[in-house]
Amino acid sequence: LRTPHDVLILMKMKKTLLMLWMAVCLIVSFTGCTSEEMDYNNPDVTLFVKQLKTGTYKMKNDKGVVEVPHFTEEDIPELLKYAEDLTIIPSFPSVYNMNNGKIRLGECMLWVIESIRQGTPPSLGCKMVLANAENYEAIYFLTDEEVLDAAACYRSWWEERQYPKTRWTIDPCYDEPLCGSGYRWW
């Protein structure tokens, strides 16, 4: 037979164990499943950017090469939101990327947009150079201010594309974001 004192102690122990169990469950729920998977064919721009900034992006193609997921024209407005972000990222996935110099997130987002626009990667890596550069040395890579200017060119290009092109408004730069800017892809 249990005394009232024993029953009280057992109730307190049960309460303490229940609270401890709840605390463990809360901790596991907040820290347990932190790795977010990217869907190659239906990628999330925000998750892509987050993983690029933390250096955790690892999406591989069929050949085992880390590459940019399959973004489409519908993703361009979201990609443009990061075009002015000059955050230096640890790496950028590109078969062609040599990671020469600092890798700016915004410049890489412009590279993704250009890849969507052309249907193929526009250059050896997510770097732009001055259009009249003598060679491909890093001294010709764009400055932060020039990258911001290039981002403005892409934003203007995207906004202009929303209007229909007619035969009366023939413009050689209609679908060329960097046309006349003095910049080109490396």
Task: Mark where each language-model region is.
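Compact alpha-helical subdomains of small soluble proteins
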Residues: 99-185
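Structural recognition of alpha-solenoid helical scaffolds
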Residues: 44, 71-78, 150
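Buried hydrophobic core positions in alpha-solenoid tandem helical repeats
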Residues: 48, 78-83
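Structural detector for internal amphipathic alpha-helices that build alpha-solenoid repeat scaffolds
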Residues: 59-71, 93-115
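Bacterial N-terminal signal peptides that target proteins for export
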Residues: 11-20
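C-terminal motif of bacterial Sec signal peptides marking the signal peptidase cleavage site
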Residues: 30-32
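Short, Lys/Arg-enriched N-terminal segments with co-localized hydrophobic residues
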Residues: 1-12
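Bacterial signal peptide processing site
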Residues: 34-36
